[in-house]
Design a protein with these regions (language model features):
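A short hydrophobic beta-strand segment most commonly corresponding to one strand
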Residues: 138-154
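Soluble periplasmic/extracytoplasmic beta-strand elements of cell-envelope proteins
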Residues: 75, 82, 144-147
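A short, N-terminal "cap"/entry segment at the start of jelly-roll beta-barrel domains
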Residues: 2-8, 14-54, 64, 98, ...
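Short, solvent-exposed loop/turn and secondary-structure capping segments
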Residues: 68, 85-87, 156-159
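Short acidic-glycine-tyrosine-enriched beta hairpin
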Residues: 55-59, 81, 85-128
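Short beta-strand His + acidic residue motifs that chelate non-heme Fe in jelly-roll/DSBH
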Residues: 65, 83-84, 125, 131-137
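Extracytoplasmic
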Residues: 47-52, 58, 68-71, 78, ...
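A short beta-loop-beta micro-motif enriched in histidine and acidic residues
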Residues: 45-46, 61-75, 92-95, 100
Length: 161
């Protein structure tokens, strides 16, 4: 029995150490991405595909580090999105102008910085910016995303360290 005890302890430590990783992977898998419209090679953007998506992120779900092969605008319409820029550039956070003119920049998220984006604000993501996001506040987050990506590129590309 005494010889088995160290093996049992090691096995338990491995299970405990990997449980958080497995839980995070399961939570990220619960994200719903509905492509509402898709248009390839729109006028003035040959070699690109334009998308309109509705992304629903369950409460407490973390989207791991990723980037996009093109620009995106994401309008948060429900909940609060905790958004972190890891590297690769700045992301502007804007709010609509009530007169329909140019949106007002309310914040610029620098690399290494996190900002909570509430419903009513939008993020403007340049291509290639590595970032992650999380639905915070105990509520789901719904974001409408307009993307202009390189033809054939996936909607997002996960970054592995």
């Amino acid at each position: 029995m005494s010889r088995r005890l160290p093996l049992i302890i090691i096995a338990l430590l491995v299970v405990i150490a990997t449980a958080g990783v497995a839980t995070a992977a399961l939570r990220a898998a619960a994200v719903e991405r509905d492509v509402l419209a898709r248009f390839t090679n729109p006028r003035g953007a040959d070699g690109r595909t334009m998308y309109l998506q509705r992304v629903t992120i369950p409460a407490g779900t973390l989207l791991p580090d990723h980037f996009h092969d093109g620009s995106q605008v994401g309008a948060v319409v429900e909940g609060t999105l905790r958004y972190t820029v890891v590297r690769g550039g700045r992301v502007k956070v804007v709010t609509p102008d009530p007169t329909g003119q140019k949106p007002a920049v309310v914040h610029t998220i620098e690399p290494g910085e996190t900002y909570d984006v509430p419903a009513g604000e939008s993020v403007i993501e340049p291509a290639g910016v590595v970032h992650h996001a999380e639905a915070v506040g105990g509520h789901r987050v719904v974001v409408y995303v307009s993307s202009l990506l390189v033809n054939g590129a996936p909607l997002s590309q996960r970054v592995t360290v």
